[in-house]
């Protein structure tokens, strides 16, 4: 099983030695200008109702560019040399440096002092920092948190400048109701009347099977859908599995059909050849085994991707949710489709629950298609001044780091999940 890991396209030594500003601030300078940065007013991480794609977010991000330009002009911050797993109760000289680092971006009140003790104030500051960077807010200093802390201030400034340009490209009318999929954040937002209605953790495309940036329309919800296995998965996964376990298809409710639509029994196929690639493999409905779970959300587009439920709910609690073959898995999918179908006659929450309970194949075309924007935003801010950063997981920022604090994926507990990742 893979654990959380950090991988950099540039070495850690290069980050520390070559990328930081030549003049880093002293502790006194940091504390002095941090008073003007109003860190104390923003120690907590509020739940903003401002959509990532909105005029308000654009204006806030433009303002944050100026703030980070000021940070850079004042010398940025020192690289943090600290052991991983520092937590409440620890005493270490690195905690003093950690306090100074958190003060600069407003995650810790300067009044918290310069003690080498990792107290509850430092823990709260670390949690706030982690939340702003898409990390699990444990309050413990781990490798991923240290890597994010050590991204140089000029890099963060460039990241903000790049994303202002991206946000401006969405400055037109996006619609009365729309959906945002922010790929680097692995996050889905439903937006209505300019406010976020719901937020959902998501599973998005792997680094080598990227989710596309696109604008499209959601047209229908398929309940208890079939899943047609892609040809690449038949070749790479199903054939080897059947060679090892002839009962595999039956146990996973996967059926074989000829081009004429005739069902073929598994024992009729020569699994020691490529004969299987000539057939269609279809997994029966059933949220417990079907790779799309109980729901597929149709989005006609040239990439052949869609949104769906998943039987692998555990991914939503992980930092690293770049696990699919390009499609987007949605947490709390019932809340999501209830919102999608709210203006479609006869599709209230009660009816949706009845369809789930019945387990029957049912399609629900939306009476009004909903716009959906799959976007790539790695830095943005809210009007309250809270700035968010995410790893440049697909290396679209071009700042020299594929993922500055990438959290490695957790291998599926069930090995059969590995091939059912859409």
Question: What spans do the regions from the language model cover?
Answer:
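A short acidic/small-residue loop/turn micro-motif
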Residues: 15-18, 204-205
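Well-ordered beta-sheet/strand-loop patches within structured domains
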Residues: 25-110, 114-132, 136, 143-422
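Sec/Tat signal peptide C-region and signal peptidase I cleavage site
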Residues: 20-24
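Proline-rich low-complexity regions
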Residues: 18-19, 212
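N-terminal secretory signal peptides and thylakoid transit peptides that target proteins
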Residues: 1-14
């Amino acid at each position: 099983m893979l654990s959380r890991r950090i991988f950099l396209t540039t070495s850690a030594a290069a980050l520390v030695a070559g990328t930081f500003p030549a003049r880093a601030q002293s502790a006194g300078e940091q504390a002095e200008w941090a008073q003007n940065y109003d860190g104390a007013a923003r120690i907590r991480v509020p739940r903003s109702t401002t959509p990532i794609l909105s005029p308000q977010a654009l204006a806030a991000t433009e303002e944050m560019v100026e703030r980070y330009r000021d940070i850079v002009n004042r010398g940025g911050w020192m690289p943090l040399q600290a052991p991983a797993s520092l937590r409440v109760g620890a005493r270490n000289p690195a905690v003093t440096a950690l306090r100074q680092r958190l003060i600069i971006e407003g995650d810790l009140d300067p009044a918290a002092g310069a003690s080498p003790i990792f107290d509850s104030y430092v823990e709260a500051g670390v949690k706030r920092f982690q939340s702003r960077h898409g990390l699990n807010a444990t309050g413990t200093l781990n490798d991923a948190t240290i890597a994010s802390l050590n991204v140089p201030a000029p890099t963060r400034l460039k990241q903000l400048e790049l994303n202002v340009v991206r946000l401006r490209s969405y400055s037109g009318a996006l619609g009365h109701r729309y959906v945002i999929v922010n790929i680097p954040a692995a996050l889905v937002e439903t937006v209505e009347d300019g406010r976020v209605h719901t937020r959902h953790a998501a599973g998005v495309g792997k680094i080598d099977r990227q989710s596309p940036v696109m604008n499209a329309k959601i047209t229908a919800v398929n309940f208890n859908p079939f899943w047609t296995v892609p040809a690449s998965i038949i070749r790479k996964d199903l054939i080897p599995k059947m060679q090892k376990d002839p009962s595999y298809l039956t146990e996973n409710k996967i059926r074989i059909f000829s081009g004429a639509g005739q069902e073929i029994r598994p024992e009729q196929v020569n699994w020691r050849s490529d004969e299987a690639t000539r057939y269609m493999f279809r997994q029966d409905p059933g949220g417990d085994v079907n790779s799309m779970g109980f729901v597929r959300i149709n989005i006609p587009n040239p990439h052949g991707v869609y949104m769906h439920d998943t039987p692998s709910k555990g991914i939503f609690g992980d930092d690293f949710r770049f696990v699919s073959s390009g499609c987007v898995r949605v947490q709390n999918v019932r809340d999501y489709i209830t919102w999608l179908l709210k203006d479609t006659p006869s599709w209230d929450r009660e009816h949706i629950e009845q369809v789930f309970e019945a387990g029957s194949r049912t399609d629900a075309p939306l009476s009004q298609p909903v716009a959906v924007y799959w976007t790539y935003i790695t830095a943005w801010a809210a009007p309250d001044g809270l700035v968010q950063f995410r790893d440049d997981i697909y290396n679209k920022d071009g700042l020299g780091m594929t993922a500055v604090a990438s959290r490695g994926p957790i291998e599926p507990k069930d090995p059969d999940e590995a091939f059912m990742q859409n």
